[in-house]
Design a protein with these regions (language model features):
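Residues embedded in well-ordered regular secondary structure
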Residues: 1-68, 105-108, 136-152, 164-170, ...
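Small-side-chain secondary-structure face that scaffolds active or pore-lining regions
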Residues: 65-75, 95-108, 168-177, 182-220
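Transmembrane beta-barrel wall of Gram-negative outer-membrane proteins
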Residues: 29-104, 115, 122, 176-180
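Context-gated lysine
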Residues: 2, 18, 46-49, 79, ...
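A surface-exposed, glycine/aromatic-enriched loop/edge motif typical of exported proteins
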Residues: 1-7, 97-151, 208-210, 216-219
Length: 220
């Protein structure tokens, strides 16, 4: 059994004028890929009389299972102890954390970015998603499997999943600065006096790039 697909009605598509066979074609594995993580660690330490220090840095980059998604993690640590005088001890500790998530996978029923939800609940099992990887027409509009009509080939309900993956960008950036300092003084009779300072500075940034041609963001 052959049937006319939205792509066969699209003059800009390689499938124009080519009916498709009515068969199961909705393979959600076509939407995803294997994620890869690359981690680098560097550390340095030095210890001599009345002084020791250590510096470490870790950088981790991970590609997500969704196209156009990734994550970055960076950790910096610095710790040192020294005795400026025989009766004084100084300790300094600093930690920095950077975390960025780009297009992290989302769940829930929001109808705007959860591609998996749209295509498991509302997808048509005869749609071959691989045919829609070339989602953009020369004029910038998107091809989709649920058009309004023959003369109006814009999305009626759901956007092309590949368009959502590549045209929508959502970034969250977290930064933490944690530091502490100790100064202690040796007193007679095995007593000690000192002061300790602690600090914690945090930062958060959210960025969203929403495509203007998306039906899913018209009311958002």
């Amino acid at each position: 059994v052959k049937y006319v697909t939205p792509l066969s009605l699209d003059e800009t598509s390689d499938y124009y004028g080519k009916p498709a066979t009515w068969q199961h074609g909705l393979d959600l594995r076509d939407l995803y890929r294997t994620g890869v993580t690359n981690t680098t660690n560097v550390s340095f330490s030095k210890s001599v009389k009345d002084f020791n220090t250590r510096v470490s840095f870790t950088n981790s980059y991970r590609t997500g299972v969704q196209p156009n998604s990734d994550a970055i993690r960076r950790f910096l640590g610095f710790k040192t102890n020294f005795k400026p005088t025989p009766w004084m001890n100084v300790s300094l500790d600093y930690k920095y954390t950077y975390r960025q998530d780009h297009n992290a996978a989302e769940s829930g029923y929001n109808g705007s970015r959860t591609v998996l939800q749209e295509y498991t609940q509302w997808g048509q099992t005869n749609v071959n998603l691989k045919d829609y990887k070339d989602y953009k027409r020369p004029d910038g509009s998107w091809r989709t499997w649920n058009i309004n009509s023959v003369n109006n080939q814009s999305a009626a309900f759901h956007d092309n999943p590949y368009a959502l993956f590549h045209e929508y960008n959502h970034r969250t950036i977290y930064q933490w600065n944690v530091f502490s300092g100790d100064v202690s003084v040796d007193l007679p009779y095995n007593l000690k006096a000192g002061v300790r300072v602690n600090g914690n500075i945090r930062g958060y940034k959210l960025e969203r790039e929403r495509p203007s041609g998306s039906i899913n963001f018209r009311s958002n």
